[in-house]
Regions:
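A short acidic, glycine-rich active-site loop
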Residues: 10-14, 157-158
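Glycine-rich FAD pyrophosphate-binding loop
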Residues: 1-2
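Mobile amphipathic helical/loop "lid" adjacent to a hydrophobic cofactor/ligand pocket
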Residues: 5-9, 16-141, 145
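Helical element adjacent to the flavin cofactor pocket in flavoenzyme catalytic cores
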Residues: 140-181
């Protein structure tokens, strides 16, 4: 930024103790400092009053006008319903994509376009058109394993202190030059 260099992580950014035990062990063994991180999600639809974040009711209704917006309320209802019903054992078509499943479940356009597709796009750094092509089975398993279908008791997320450069430099310093020839 300007003349100041700012480190940017482009690989993994956050992790938790439940889902990433080997990574945690790797950081501990290599004395890599970690710190708590915030794993939040928000959406603002340009040129509309449609916006929310996932931080409690005040976040969901950060724009109070949405308390009276039927489409917004339907999206919130669909979020609750989808999260409650999203179980791999309920899926009979193991080859179905996320996009086709969402259509089959008759979920609102707002839920699809302003919640689940943007969230998938953000997590996997993919364009929205590609998010719908994701295999449903993979999506459900990932969200279940990472506690993303929970409204309460989600895992605490962490990141590497001073970002990935810290552990990359630490590991490189422990490897002899002969491995890089």
């Amino acid at each position: 930024i300007g003349k100041k260099k700012v480190p940017v992580d482009i690989g993994f950014i956050v992790f938790n103790f439940k889902t990433y035990p080997n990574l945690i062990k790797f950081f501990e063994e290599n004395k890599i400092d970690i710190e708590k991180s915030d794993m939040s999600f928000s959406v603002k639809v340009e040129n509309s009053n449609f916006e929310y974040c996932g931080k409690g009711l005040s976040g969901i209704f950060s724009n109070r006008m949405n308390l009276f917006n039927f489409k917004f309320l339907k999206m919130v209802f669909d979020i609750v319903k989808f999260y409650k019903d999203s179980d791999l054992s309920n899926v009979t078509d193991k080859e179905i994509t996320l996009g086709n499943y969402l259509i089959k479940k008759n979920l609102s356009k707002e839920f699809i376009n302003y919640h689940i597709i943007p969230m998938v796009s953000a997590i996997w750094s993919m364009p929205p058109y590609a998010a719908g092509k994701m295999p449903l089975k993979f999506f459900l398993k990932f969200f279940q394993n990472h506690g993303l279908f929970k409204f309460k008791n989600r895992p605490q997320w962490y990141t590497v202190s001073k970002r990935s450069r810290t552990y990359v430099e630490s590991i490189i310093s422990k490897i002899s030059g002969q491995h890089f020839k």
